[in-house]
C-alpha cells in the first residue's frame, strides 16, 4: 500500500530548497526556531488518534480510490472531490427532470378518468329517475299480497285454535261421559283457548275475545265441577296403603290444584278422613295387636313398655316417624308434589297427624311427670331432640310435629331441672350430708352428683359426639342459674348449670364448718380436684367449666403452698431467725421506713436469736428436722386427694424454704465477716462478755454450720 506521506528524500530536498531562501533573508527566524516549529507540527500529526471512526473511514475511502501520496495528488485532491460532487448533483437533477415529466403524464390520465366518471354518474342518475316509480308500484303490490295471505292464515289459525267443537264440549261437561285421556286433552285445549283469549282483549275486536272467554269459562267451570264430584266419590273408597293407586286420581288432583277452592275442599275432606284413620291406628298400636288377627302375635302393644319411659317414648316416636314417612311417601305418589311444592305436602301430612300428635303429647307428659330419674329424663330430652331434628328435615321446622317435639323437649328438660333443684333443696336441709368427711375428701352428695353428671355426659357424648356443639340447647328456666360465660356455651351447658353448679356451691359452702384454714383449704382442694377429674375427659363440659375450676385450684394451690412453707419454717426453727433478720431483709422500704437508718450487719451479733445458745438450739432443731423433712412435709398434706398435686406444692415450698435458708446463711457469713473486719472496714464489736468472746473465736458459722447446698441435697 502506498504511503500517505512522501519519501524521506523528497521531504528533505523540499526542505532544503525552502530553507535556502529564507536563510538569506534577514527577517527569517533563527534556525533553532524553525526546527522547533517543525517538531511541534510532527508531534501534533503523530499524536492524532487514527482510531477515530471518521479518520478511519476517510483513509479507507482514499485507499479504495487508489490514490498515491504525492505532492501533485495532495494539491489536486480537494478539486477532484469537489468536481465529483458537482457531477453527482448534475446526475440527480437530470433524474428528477425525468420524474417530473412522468408526473405530468399521470396528471393528464387522472383528469381524463375524472371526466369519464362524471359522465357515467350522470347516466346512472337519469336511469334511477326513470325506474323509481315502477319499483314503488311493484313493492306496494307485493305488500298487499303479503297482507292478504297473512289475513287468510290468521283466519284459518283463529278458527282452528279458538273454536272448540260442540261434541268435545259435551264430553267435557256431561256427567255421564267418562274421565279419560280424551277428556283431559279437551280440557287442556279449552284452558289454552281461555288463556289465549286474553291476547284478543288487547286487539281491535274486544267483543270477540270477551265472548270466547265467557264461553270457555263456562266450559271450564263445568269440567272442574265434574272432576270435584268424581274425586269425592273416589276418596270414599281410597286406600293409601294400596300401592296400586289409580293414575286418574293423581291426574285429577293435579288439575284441581288449579282451582284452590275446590282443591282445598278435597284436601279438607281427605285430611279429616286420614286423621281419623291414623288416630285409630295409633291407638290400636298402643293398646291392641299391631295388625289385627293377621299380624305377628309376638309383637306386643306399646303400652306394655310404659314402665320404661325411655323405651315407651322411643317406641311411640318410632311409630309416629314410620307412619309419617309412609304417609308422606303415599301422598307424594298420590299428588306427585306438583300442586304446591314440598310445603303444601308437609302441611297435608301435618293435618293427617293432628290426632296422633295430641295423643302423643298427652302420653309423653304423663310419663315424664311420673318419673324422677334425672338421667332417664335427660335421655328422653336427647331422644326428643333427635326426633325433633328428624321431623324438621322431613316436614319443615314450622310443622306441628316439629313444634310439638320442641315443646316436649323443653317440658322434659324443665322437669329435669326441677328434679335437680329438688335434690339440691333436700341436701341443703340435711346437715349430716353437709358435714365434711373426716378424711376431708369430697362429700358423698357431691360424689353422687358427679356420678349422675358422668352418666349425663356419657349420654350426651353418645348422642352428639365429644366435640362441643355451639348451638344452644334447651332454654333454661327461671329456676336455673344464669350462664356464666355466654360466649362459650354449648348444648350441654344448661345441664351443667343444673347438675353441677348447685352441688358444687353446696360443697364449697360446707367448708365453713371446718375448724382451721388448713383443713378448709385441703377440703376445697379435694372438691375441685374431684370435679376437674370428672369433667376433663368431656370437651363439651370442660370448655365452659374447666377454666373456673382451674382458677380456683390455682388459688387453693397458693394457699397450700403458703401452709407447707410455714410448716417447713416452723418445724426447722428457721422462722425464728427470719423474724430476727426481718430488718435486714432486702425488701423495698416504705415511705416511713426510709427515714429510719438501715441497721448495721454487726447488729446481728446482738440479736437474741443469734446468741450462741439460742443459735445452737435452732441448729440442733434444724438437724433433727432435715432427715425426715420431705416425708413430714408430704405427710402434712396427706389428705389432699392428688399425690401429684401434693408433690408439686411441696417442691415449690421446699424451693422457697431453700431461698430463705440461703438468705439466713448469707447474713451469718456477713456478720462473721463484719466481726473480723472483712469487707466492712476497721469496725469491731466492742460489746464484750463471755459469750461474745466465744463468738469471736469461732464465729456464728461455727454455731450454724449447715449450708444451702446441704439443705437442697437433703430436701431433694
Swiss-Prot record:
Family under the similarity heading: Belongs to the COG6 family.
Ranges of compositional bias, category Low complexity: 12-26
Subcellular location, record wording: Golgi apparatus membrane
Principal localisation: Golgi
A GO cellular-component term linked to this record: Golgi membrane
GO biological process: intra-Golgi vesicle-mediated transport; protein transport
Source domain of life: Eukaryota
Topological category with respect to the lipid bilayer: Peripheral membrane protein
Keyword annotations from UniProtKB, A to Z: Golgi apparatus, Membrane, Protein transport, Transport
Chain positions covered by the region annotation Disordered: 1-35, 463-491
Entry protein name: Conserved oligomeric Golgi complex subunit 6
Stated role: Acts as a component of the peripheral membrane COG complex that is involved in intra-Golgi protein trafficking. COG is located at the cis-Golgi, and regulates tethering of retrograde intra-Golgi vesicles and possibly a number of other membrane trafficking events.
Amino acid at each position: 500500500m502506498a504511503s500517505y506521506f512522501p519519501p524521506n528524500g523528497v521531504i528533505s530536498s523540499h526542505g532544503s530548497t525552502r530553507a535556502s531562501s529564507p536563510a538569506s533573508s534577514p527577517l527569517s527566524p533563527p534556525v533553532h526556531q524553525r526546527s522547533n516549529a517543525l517538531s511541534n507540527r510532527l508531534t501534533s500529526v503523530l499524536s492524532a488518534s487514527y482510531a477515530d471512526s471518521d479518520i478511519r473511514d476517510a483513509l479507507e475511502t482514499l485507499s479504495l480510490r487508489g490514490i498515491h501520496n504525492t505532492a501533485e495528488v495532495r494539491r489536486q485532491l480537494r478539486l477532484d472531490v469537489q468536481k465529483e460532487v458537482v457531477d453527482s448533483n448534475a446526475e440527480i437533477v437530470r433524474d428528477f427532470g425525468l420524474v417530473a415529466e412522468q408526473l405530468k403524464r399521470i396528471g393528464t390520465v387522472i383528469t381524463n378518468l375524472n371526466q369519464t366518471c362524471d359522465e357515467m354518474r350522470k347516466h346512472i342518475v337519469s336511469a334511477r329517475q326513470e325506474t323509481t316509480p315502477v319499483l314503488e308500484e311493484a313493492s306496494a303490490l307485493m305488500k298487499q299480497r303479503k297482507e292478504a295471505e297473512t289475513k287468510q292464515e290468521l283466519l284459518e289459525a283463529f278458527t282452528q285454535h279458538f273454536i272448540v267443537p260442540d261434541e268435545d264440549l259435551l264430553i267435557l261437561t256431561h256427567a255421564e261421559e267418562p274421565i279419560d285421556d280424551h277428556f283431559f286433552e279437551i280440557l287442556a285445549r279449552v284452558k289454552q283457548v281461555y288463556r289465549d283469549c286474553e291476547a284478543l282483549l288487547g286487539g281491535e275486536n274486544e267483543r270477540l275475545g270477551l265472548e270466547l272467554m265467557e264461553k270457555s269459562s263456562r266450559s271450564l267451570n263445568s269440567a272442574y265441577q265434574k272432576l270435584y264430584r268424581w274425586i269425592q266419590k273416589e276418596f270414599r273408597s281410597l286406600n293409601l296403603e294400596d300401592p296400586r293407586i289409580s293414575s286418574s286420581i293423581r291426574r285429577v288432583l293435579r288439575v284441581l290444584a288449579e282451582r284452590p277452592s275446590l282443591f282445598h275442599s278435597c284436601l279438607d275432606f281427605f285430611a279429616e278422613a286420614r286423621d281419623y284413620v291414623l288416630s285409630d291406628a295409633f291407638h290400636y298400636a298402643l293398646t291392641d295387636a299391631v295388625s289385627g288377627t293377621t299380624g305377628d302375635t309376638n309383637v306386643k302393644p306399646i303400652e306394655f313398655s310404659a314402665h320404661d319411659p325411655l323405651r315407651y317414648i322411643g317406641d311411640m316416636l318410632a311409630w309416629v316417624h314410620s307412619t309419617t314417612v309412609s304417609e308422606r311417601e303415599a301422598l307424594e305418589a298420590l299428588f306427585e308434589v306438583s300442586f304446591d311444592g314440598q310445603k303444601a305436602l308437609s302441611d297435608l301430612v301435618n293435618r293427617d297427624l293432628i290426632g296422633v300428635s295430641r295423643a302423643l303429647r298427652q302420653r309423653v307428659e304423663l310419663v315424664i311427670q311420673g318419673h324422677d330419674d334425672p338421667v332417664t329424663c335427660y335421655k328422653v330430652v336427647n331422644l326428643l331432640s333427635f326426633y325433633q331434628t328428624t321431623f324438621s328435615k322431613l316436614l319443615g321446622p314450622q310443622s306441628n310435629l316439629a313444634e310439638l317435639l320442641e315443646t316436649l323437649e323443653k317440658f322434659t328438660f324443665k322437669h329435669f331441672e326441677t328434679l335437680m333443684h329438688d335434690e339440691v333443696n333436700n341436701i341443703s336441709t340435711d346437715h349430716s350430708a353437709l358435714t365434711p368427711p373426716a378424711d376431708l375428701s369430697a362429700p358423698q352428695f357431691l360424689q353422687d352428683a358427679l356420678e349422675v353428671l358422668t352418666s349425663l355426659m356419657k349420654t350426651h357424648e353418645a348422642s352428639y359426639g365429644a366435640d362441643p356443639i355451639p348451638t344452644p340447647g334447651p332454654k333454661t328456666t327461671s329456676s336455673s342459674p344464669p350462664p356464666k360465660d355466654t360466649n362459650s356455651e354449648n348444648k350441654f351447658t344448661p345441664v351443667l348449670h343444673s347438675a353441677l353448679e348447685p352441688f358444687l356451691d353446696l360443697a364449697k359452702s360446707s367448708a365453713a364448718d371446718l375448724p382451721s384454714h388448713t383443713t378448709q383449704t385441703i377440703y376445697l382442694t379435694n372438691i375441685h380436684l374431684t370435679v376437674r377429674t370428672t369433667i376433663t375427659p368431656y370437651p363439651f363440659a370442660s370448655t365452659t367449666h374447666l377454666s373456673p375450676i382451674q382458677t380456683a385450684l390455682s388459688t387453693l394451690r397458693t394457699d397450700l403452698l403458703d401452709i407447707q412453707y410455714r410448716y417447713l419454717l416452723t418445724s426447722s426453727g428457721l422462722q425464728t431467725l427470719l423474724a430476727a433478720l426481718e430488718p435486714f431483709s432486702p425488701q423495698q422500704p416504705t415511705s416511713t421506713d426510709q427515714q429510719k437508718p438501715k441497721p448495721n450487719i454487726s447488729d446481728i451479733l446482738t440479736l437474741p436469736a443469734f446468741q450462741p445458745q439460742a443459735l445452737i438450739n435452732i441448729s440442733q432443731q434444724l438437724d433433727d428436722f432435715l432427715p425426715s423433712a420431705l416425708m413430714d412435709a408430704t405427710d402434712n398434706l396427706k389428705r389432699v386427694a392428688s399425690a401429684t398435686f401434693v408433690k408439686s406444692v411441696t417442691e415449690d415450698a421446699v424451693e422457697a424454704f431453700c431461698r430463705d435458708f440461703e438468705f439466713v446463711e448469707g447474713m451469718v457469713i456477713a456478720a462473721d465477716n463484719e466481726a473480723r473486719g472483712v469487707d466492712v472496714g476497721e469496725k469491731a464489736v466492742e460489746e464484750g462478755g463471755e459469750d461474745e468472746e466465744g463468738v469471736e473465736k469461732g464465729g456464728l458459722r461455727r454455731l450454724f454450720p449447715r449450708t444451702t447446698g446441704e439443705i437442697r441435697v437433703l430436701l431433694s
